[in-house]
């Protein structure tokens, strides 16, 4: 009963401070973004090579393109990655310490290089540090001599049902001036995201001639100002596939998997493109739109096994990340996620997934809680219906990439679509406790804290548990 009262007060307070409605259906925003006349070629749209955000750090063999992600299942590990021009002694070492201790520790990473067409990468270092203390600020140092560089990160709180935590949400960002605006906008948001859930499509280097992998390097330097200090949880998108038989590249995901590791083995996954983590009060499952997912496939078998491990008494918020949206009312990529929806949606509903975040479509859209699990080829019930056990689907592929906005929408707006707008921006998912979380979407043209769309979410699992408790009283 106490949890019910706390949850209701949280909801009432949220409505007073931010008077938004629950799932207002059918809104197509009237806001029209002033176009920067997106051009067809990445060379014409991406920031110039000599942009200050692409600057190479000074010093001999200086570490660059520094980024971190969660390094284990529970949140006590971090993977630190960086590149150096040369594989010199000391280049592969991380020195780290907590702000509460003067004792410094050292860890050694692994080093890899890869080739892609006529490009050979720099030396790419990955160092996994485990057994860190929860909810603690750590500093870490890379490099040596005049090339030393220092960064920091904060580990998440220990997983627990009422642990508050704030996630930033970014997708399909690329490296245009709009991309820079999106990242700046996120950094300035007073909500202060503690980690980023990234919905895929990083550098868009494949839009350059021969998939110019130098654009992976510029993107790594551009994003470092955020991802070196807070973990980004990676989802692979179609622009990470890099399958290009016309230039002799037959192995997919080569640049992405060499540069951006994930803690997939910690969740029993045999592939870095799908995995799961626990972070504070959230259990996050990352799926791959561009890997096999039909019944009996490795991803399918892993996914169904992972769902059985979710403990909603420990991590009540069940979140799924997948690049291609399963519900999408834009003309761009319309119904591309339909096959995956048919396979996975029954599990989303049965296990009461709270929210599914996607990218791919270069605009913003939020759905009602709907499902289409009743459909089969015999009964032809192919219209989504309201379903309180279903997740909210949010498409946030509006990071600012060189392909521009997806502005053409299907008409009329389908009943499952609650809000849609063709603008660049980012999102915030703010978990308050086991029962309530607040989602907000922030378009780049507004002040960083202005909410162009927002929604209070009632946890699917605990809502049903509380309802059962109330009915039994």
UniProtKB/Swiss-Prot annotation:
Keywords: Disulfide bond, Glycoprotein, Hydrolase, Iron, Metal-binding, Secreted, Signal, Zinc. Binds 1 Fe cation per subunit. Glycans are attached at residues 118, 180, 311, 433. Gene3D superfamilies: 3.60.21.10, Purple acid phosphatase-like, N-terminal. Fe cation binds at residues 172, 201, 204, 362. It catalyses: a phosphate monoester + H2O = an alcohol + phosphate. Substrate binds at residues 238, 360-362. The active site is at residue 333. One of its GO terms (molecular function) is metal ion binding. Its cofactor is Fe cation; Mn(2+); Zn(2+); Cu(2+). SUPFAM superfamilies: Metallo-dependent phosphatases (SSF56300), Purple acid phosphatase, N-terminal domain (SSF49363). One of its GO terms (cellular component) is extracellular region. It is found in: Secreted. It comes from the Eukaryota. Its EC number is 3.1.3.2. Residues 1-38 form the signal peptide. Optimum pH is 4.5. Belongs to the metallophosphoesterase superfamily. Purple acid phosphatase family. Homodimer; disulfide-linked. This is Purple acid phosphatase 1.
């Amino acid at each position: 009963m106490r949890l019910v009262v706390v949850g209701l007060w949280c909801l009432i307070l949220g409505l007073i401070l931010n008077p938004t409605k629950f799932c207002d259906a059918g809104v197509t925003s009237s806001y029209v973004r002033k176009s920067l006349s997106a051009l067809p070629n990445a060379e014409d749209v991406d920031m110039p090579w000599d942009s200050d955000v692409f600057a190479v750090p000074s010093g001999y063999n200086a570490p660059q393109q520094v980024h971190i992600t969660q390094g284990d299942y529970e949140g006590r590990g971090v993977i630190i990655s960086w590149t150096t021009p040369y594989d010199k002694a000391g280049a592969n070492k991380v020195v780290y310490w907590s702000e509460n201790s003067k004792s410094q520790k050292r860890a050694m990473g692994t080093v890899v290089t890869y080739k892609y067409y006529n490009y050979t990468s720099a030396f790419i270092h990955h160092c996994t540090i485990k057994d860190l203390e929860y909810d603690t600020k750590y500093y870490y140092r890379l490099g040596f001599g005049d090339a030393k560089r220092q960064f920091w990160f904060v580990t998440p709180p220990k997983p627990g049902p009422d642990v508050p935590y704030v996630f930033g949400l970014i997708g399909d960002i690329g490296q245009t001036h709009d991309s820079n605006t999106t990242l700046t906008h996120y950094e300035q948001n007073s909500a202060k995201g503690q980690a980023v859930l990234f919905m895929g499509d990083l550098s868009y280097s494949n839009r350059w001639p021969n998939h110019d992998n130098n654009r992976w390097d510029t993107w790594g330097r551009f994003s470092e100002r955020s991802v070196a200090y807070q973990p980004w949880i990676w989802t692979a998108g179609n622009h990470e596939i890099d399958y290009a038989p016309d230039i002799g590249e037959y192995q997919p995901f080569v640049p992405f998997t060499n540069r951006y590791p994930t803690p997939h083995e910690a969740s029993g996954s045999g592939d870095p493109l799908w995995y799961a983590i626990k972070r504070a009060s959230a259990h996050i499952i990352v799926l791959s739109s561009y890997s096999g997912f039909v019944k009996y496939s490795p991803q399918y078998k892993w996914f169904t096994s992972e769902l059985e491990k979710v403990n909603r008494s420990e991590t009540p918020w069940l979140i799924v990340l997948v690049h291609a949206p399963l519900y999408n009312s834009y003309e761009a990529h319309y119904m591309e996620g339909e096959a995956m929806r048919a396979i996975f949606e029954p599990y989303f509903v049965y296990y009461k997934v709270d929210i599914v975040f996607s990218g791919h479509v270069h605009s913003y859209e939020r759905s009602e809680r709907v499902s289409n699990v009743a459909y089969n080829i015999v009964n032809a019930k192919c219209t989504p219906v309201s379903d309180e056990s279903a997740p909210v689907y949010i498409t946030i592929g509006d990071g600012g990439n060189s392909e521009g906005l997806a502005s053409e929408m299907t008409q009329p707006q389908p009943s499952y679509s609650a809000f849609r707008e063709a603008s660049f921006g980012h999102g915030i998912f703010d978990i308050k406790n086991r029962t309530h979380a607040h989602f907000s979407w922030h378009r780049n043209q507004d002040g960083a804290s202005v909410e162009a769309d927002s929604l209070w979410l009632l946890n699917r699992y605990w809502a049903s548990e509380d309802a059962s408790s109330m009915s039994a009283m």
